[in-house]
Design a protein with these regions (language model features):
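N-terminal secretory signal peptides that target proteins for export/translocation
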Residues: 1-6
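Bacterial N-terminal signal peptides
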Residues: 9-20
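Acidic, serine/threonine-rich low-complexity disordered tracts
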Residues: 21-146, 185-292
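Active-site/ligand-binding surface loops and adjacent short beta/alpha elements
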Residues: 146-200
Length: 292
């Protein structure tokens, strides 16, 4: 039987690539000897690799038991404070027995600069842990960053938003959607690593991500060539220090190794068993791809 506390330790962390509850991970094949490519852009450098109208749908499973559906959708190009941005929105919805035990209906919205690929604003609306009525609202104003301080506000239901400034360690801060979009475009030799700070919901997480190697992945869309990224992560406090209650987690992401660079699967090993988020449908969009 799935306990009600399951939401706090797994489902509530679903959108951050299934890592907030993991212990060890990684379905891995040994990396091959890298071939040095021509000059490659840095992580996240340049326009985001998305197409307006693009939509990806995933099934989330724990040991073969379906828990939730997740979608990642790309909206239109829109103006935000005088800057052209593209809206990218993630949505997680619990299904079946999991929905009756711990309802999830959470939305994560990013406004990503169409030139730099950096997120300028990140808004989250999600159920409070173990509640089916109270909704938490978090807004991170990444465009208003000042020095090492990132303005974040938090409110429960209709309460007045309270400031929760976040201290940062790196020149760039990412949110979950922008991180996944940047991962799509990242090309470098196998073994190349990057340290990042990424917002997942209300909190900031430190991630060390490495290009792991090439695989063949069997999906509902067929057998596809894939590039694997392996990572570790831990939660940070508002002061930018490692949260003493946060263990190091491991996860892997597979992205199609073709022109589409579509996120195909995310896996983690959790205290409850193996968790997989697998693609079940892909719509390429009808607009102009923002990254040539």
């Amino acid at each position: 039987m799935i306990r009600a506390s399951f939401r706090a330790s797994f489902l509530g962390s679903l959108l951050f690539v299934l890592v907030a509850c993991g212990s060890s991970s990684s379905i891995a094949t040994p990396p091959t000897t890298p071939t040095e490519p021509a000059q490659q852009p840095e992580f996240g450098e340049g326009p985001p690799l998305v197409t307006p109208g693009e939509r990806m749908t995933y099934r989330v499973e724990l040991a073969g038991f379906e828990l939730a559906q997740m979608t990642l959708a790309v909206g239109d190009v829109t103006d935000l404070g005088g800057t052209k941005t593209v809206i990218v929105q993630g949505h997680a919805k619990s299904v079946g027995l999991a929905d009756r035990i711990a309802a999830i209906d959470d939305t994560f919205t990013s406004w990503i600069d169409v030139e730099s690929g950096r997120s300028l604003r990140f808004a989250v609306d999600e159920f409070e842990t173990n509640s089916k009525t109270n909704i938490e609202h978090t807004i991170a104003d990444l465009a208003a960053r000042s020095g090492d301080q990132l303005p974040i506000t938090f409110a429960l239901n209709d309460a007045t938003p309270a400031p929760e400034p976040q201290k940062l360690a790196y020149p760039d801060a990412w949110d979950y959607n922008a991180f996944l979009v940047a991962l799509r475009a990242w090309e470098a030799p196998v073994g190349t690593a990057k340290s990042l700070e990424v917002l997942r919901s209300r909190w900031l997480w430190h991630i060390d991500v490495t290009i792991g190697g090439k695989d063949k992945l069997t999906t509902e869309l067929g057998e596809l060539p894939a590039l694997r990224f392996d990572a570790t992560t831990h939660k940070l406090t508002r002061a930018g220090e490692r949260d003493p209650g946060s263990d190091e987690r491991r996860f892997s992401v597979w992205i199609s190794d073709d022109d589409g660079r579509v996120p195909l699967q995310i896996t983690a090993r959790t205290d409850y068993g193996d968790v997989k988020m697998r693609i079940v449908d892909y719509q390429p969009g009808t607009g102009q791809r923002l990254r040539p």
